[in-house]
């Protein structure tokens, strides 16, 4: 039996980024289903009725548009560039994940699917998928690495509360990559009534394009909002990167504006030069995994190496193919932030702005703390807060040696 990581099918130029990233590297058993998903997405994405249905849910259910908030205290404290925060933490379910899930769930409904499955790391994508499944009357099953179910017990209970069945994945390193493996295997075995709501801009085509399409609402809004506030484009857009959905959504509307610097912030863990890191773009090499060609943390034999981050949402051993291409082309810059720096930023933004941000987002905030003082006061940074940090309070307290009752 062929595994999900064997190259049994290759795409044409469709679904490719840069020189050769992306594509479809999947078993024959999934090719027909992927073709159906691709056709449905291409047929519906510009369909007026589908767009109206999507927009109605984004506005009246997900609470969009999200705020573009001027971080006055941070700006004054850091003494450099003007800082705006794109507040995806204020969306229904508390993160950017809902944008993509609504779009994919509508697609699933149009395909006649009755059951949604998804992987999740920090739990936010799982919560969003369970939420929309409840709204649309669909069955839902979530696959989550055992390490992550232990780290994110509150989100596990939230998913179950919403009616989802959560499967702790005990294979491999028991983290996000293993949850993706398990979900792909489940989809391959039962695609007739099931739709895989992939949470990040990864996987075989059309998933990276589809996730970007649904997440691009972040930058479409921020571009319009900043134009209304400042009548100009930002000088820099900053977002954290695991697989890369929030970052590609934050970058999308600016990619064709070379005056806007794009910065993706990866999880350096204990340090980029250690073996306890998830800084894929800085440390990874080209390979094939999870149905795509991209950059991965892997050994000389092409076996995926374990990765580490304090953040369950950023410890993925690869990155979306468009991010790999943007890095290769020099259009975007990717930097690493350590656990210690992210934890410091968690406290910093809370005390400066009264915002408890997700530890994933705090990797981006930590970079803003470094770069803003080096910029002129008439320059502007937009930093995306991908989610809220309620889920992280207990683990951050533990990291700091503070005993709290979860």
Curated annotation (Swiss-Prot):
Pathway where it operates: Amino-acid biosynthesis; L-tryptophan biosynthesis; L-tryptophan from chorismate: step 5/5
UniProt superkingdom: Bacteria
Cofactor(s), names only, from the UniProt record: pyridoxal 5'-phosphate
Keyword Transcription listed: no
Disulfide bonds: none
GO cellular component terms listed in the entry, alphabetical order: cytoplasm
Reaction(s) catalysed (UniProt annotation): (1S,2R)-1-C-(indol-3-yl)glycerol 3-phosphate + L-serine = D-glyceraldehyde 3-phosphate + L-tryptophan + H2O
Residue numbers of N6-(pyridoxal phosphate)lysine PTMs: 97
Keyword entries, A-Z: Amino-acid biosynthesis, Aromatic amino acid biosynthesis, Lyase, Pyridoxal phosphate, Tryptophan biosynthesis
InterPro entries xrefs: Trp_synth_b_CS (IPR006653), Trp_synth_beta (IPR006654), Trp_synth_beta/beta-like (IPR023026), TrpB-like_PALP (IPR001926), TrpB-like_PALP_sf (IPR036052)
Keyword Amino-acid biosynthesis listed: yes
GO molecular function per UniProt: tryptophan synthase activity
EC number: 4.2.1.20
Subunit: Tetramer of two alpha and two beta chains.
Family stated for the protein in its record: Belongs to the TrpB family.
Function recorded in the entry: The beta subunit is responsible for the synthesis of L-tryptophan from indole and L-serine.
Protein name: Tryptophan synthase beta chain
Source taxonomy: Bacteria, Bacillati, Bacillota, Bacilli, Lactobacillales
Gene of this entry: trpB
């Amino acid at each position: 039996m062929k595994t999900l990581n064997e190259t049994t099918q290759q795409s044409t130029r469709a679904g490719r980024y840069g020189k050769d990233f992306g594509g479809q590297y999947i078993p024959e058993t999934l090719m027909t289903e992927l073709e159906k998903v691709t056709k449905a997405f291409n047929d519906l994405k510009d369909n007026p009725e589908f767009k109206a249905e999507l927009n109605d849910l984004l506005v009246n259910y997900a609470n969009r548009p999200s705020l573009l908030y001027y971080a006055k205290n941070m700006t004054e404290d850091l003494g450099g560039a003007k800082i705006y925060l794109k507040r995806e933490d204020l969306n229904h379910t508390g993160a950017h994940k809902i944008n993509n899930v609504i779009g994919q769930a509508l697609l699933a409904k149009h395909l006649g699917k009755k059951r949604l499955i998804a992987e999740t790391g920090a739990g936010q994508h799982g919560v969003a998928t369970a939420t929309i499944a409840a709204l649309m009357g669909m069955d839902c099953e979530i696959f989550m690495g055992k390490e992550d179910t232990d780290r994110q017990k509150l989100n596990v209970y939230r998913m179950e509360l919403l009616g989802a069945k959560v499967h702790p994945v005990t294979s491999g390193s028991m983290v996000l990559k293993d949850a993706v493996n398990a979900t792909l295997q489940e989809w391959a075995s039962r695609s007739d009534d099931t739709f895989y709501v992939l949470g990040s801009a990864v996987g075989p085509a059309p998933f990276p394009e589809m996730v970007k399409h649904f997440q691009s609402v972040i930058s479409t809004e921020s571009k319009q909002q900043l134009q209304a506030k400042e009548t100009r484009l930002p000088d820099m857009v900053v977002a954290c990167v695991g697989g890369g959905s929030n970052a590609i959504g934050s970058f999308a509307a600016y990619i064709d504006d070379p005056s806007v610097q794009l910065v993706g912030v990866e999880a350096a863990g204990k340090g980029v030069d250690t073996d306890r890191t998830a800084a894929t773009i800085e440390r990874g090499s080209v390979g094939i995994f999870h149905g795509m060609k991209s950059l991965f943390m892997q050994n000389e034999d092409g076996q995926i190496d374990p990765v580490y981050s304090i953040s369950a949402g950023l410890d993925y051993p690869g990155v979306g193919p468009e991010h790999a291409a943007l890095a290769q082309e020099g259009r975007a810059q990717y930097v690493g932030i350590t656990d210690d720096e992210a934890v410091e930023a968690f406290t910093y933004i809370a005390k400066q702005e009264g915002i408890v941000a997700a530890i994933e987002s705090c990797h981006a905030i930590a970079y803003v703390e470094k770069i803003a003082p080096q910029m002129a006061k008439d320059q502007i940074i937009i930093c995306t807060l991908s989610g809220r940090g309620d889920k992280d309070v207990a683990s951050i307290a533990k990291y700091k040696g503070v005993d709290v009752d979860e």
